[in-house]
Amino acid sequence: MPSRLRRIYGLRDFHFITCSCYRRQPLLGTRHAREVFLRIFEQVRRKYKFEVVGYVVMPEHFHILIAEPEKGNPSTVLQVLKQSVAHRLLKPSRKRRSNQPMLWRDDGTGQHRHFWQPRFYDFNVYSNEKRAEKLRYMHENPVNRGLVPSPELWRWSSFRAYFCEEASVVRIDELDAIPKRKPNLK
């Protein structure tokens, strides 16, 4: 069994967190699923009182860049976020349609649904340079994957809040820390 990543909390670092959907299936591949994710992410942000520097929601994973929460720790935040999103998005799919990704497995005790991979990747962001690097990585992710030709066209990231001055469902706390660039809205 692979060793667990060591999580370091309590240093007041920012955390770059990546979490994947079960078996990398595109369970966040619809507009509805991504919007549900963002609404729940904002609710969790308010409940656990943490700053959000940036985020991107991709079809089969997400990245968030957050400060350590006032309540709990990043693991607690991820547990609540993942459970809430899975509960909300799996609830209407009690019966699987033929075009819906497989979310069920039988482990001998009955049917169990899966939405997320069991673990997540957490990288402590220890400098302003690393924070800017991770933010750029998130904003460029949809472009690098070929989902859109430019980051401002992907509506499920913090890019538009930073560079297009568009309100985000999720409150972004570091808007003034990143230099503005002219968006390429085509």
Language model: regions and residue ranges:
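Short catalytic/metal-binding and nucleic-acid-binding patches
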Residues: M1-K186
